[in-house]
Amino acid sequence: MDKIQKDINEALETGRRFNILKMFSVAPLFSFMIILGTYYPINLFRMASEAGRDPAVPLTSMVTQLTSVENSLIPPNSFFGFLFLFCWFCYICFYVISKRNRIKTYLLTQVLQLILFIIFYYSWFVAILYLIPLVAIRIVYWIGFVLSLIYLVYILVTKQSASKDYFSSEYYKKFLNVILFLWLLMYGINLFTNGLNHFLAYLLLALLPISPIFLGLFLVSFFKSNVVTLENLNAVNKNQEKYREEYGYTIEEWYGKKSKMYKEHVKKSKKR
């Protein structure tokens, strides 16, 4: 089974699973989980930062204050409420579209998935900045974040597929020294500012500030692997009959019983 047929099978199976019950039960729950995963990290660390250092609350001793510029880049709470409604509205639209075009439905879900993943990436990126006390390092991370987004645009424009694995041994050695240096730097800062108390805890906490590097690499790899799927689905969506006949799908399997194409096919069959 080639990649195109695999994407077609996933698209048709996803289209078959769309129903009215899921639109009012699973879709809101899924949207809520997305909001929880994007809203909670930022606000947890922001509240701890605004509370100041309180010995009774361990988290307050781990976070730092962001600059006014960084705070202005944090989306307001209303954004996450809008995102919840937007996701729910999108899935309702996908349900309607799935009744006549399953391929397009799956294509749109993949696009929405990428958008949500970028928002998730940004949310966790900002949250982790609260664990980085040095402004200079945060500036470097901000530059890296912007460059990663520019690279994503480059991937879309050039239609670059996942031809390179950033976690292979070739790239592993290049990033290992950088990651090790940053980890030791963060660990040294924690020891200098907090002393030798909770030695193991600060050893593990030193890993958190370098996690944006792993987030960025994972995002790029995930994005590149999905570019091929988006290209395949877009090509199939533009020439559905060609691919349906080429891969041997029936009209019912491809469009569904409630589709206009299937109903017209049944009418023509009865006239014969």
State where each predicted segment sits.
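N-terminal topogenic module of multi-pass integral membrane proteins
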Residues: 1-94
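Loop-to-transmembrane boundary segments
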Residues: 14-33, 74, 107-115, 167-180
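Canonical alpha-helical transmembrane segments of integral membrane proteins
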Residues: 25-43, 86, 113-125, 177-190
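Alpha-helical transmembrane segments of polytopic membrane proteins
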Residues: 27, 70-86, 137-148, 174-177, ...
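Cytoplasmic membrane-interface regions of multi-pass membrane proteins
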Residues: 88-108, 154-172, 227-234
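Juxtamembrane "helix-exit" motif on the non-cytosolic side of transmembrane helices
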Residues: 96-97, 122-136, 187-199
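Membrane-proximal helix-loop-helix units in multi-pass membrane proteins
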Residues: 112-172
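C-terminal transmembrane-bundle signature of multipass membrane proteins
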Residues: 178-272
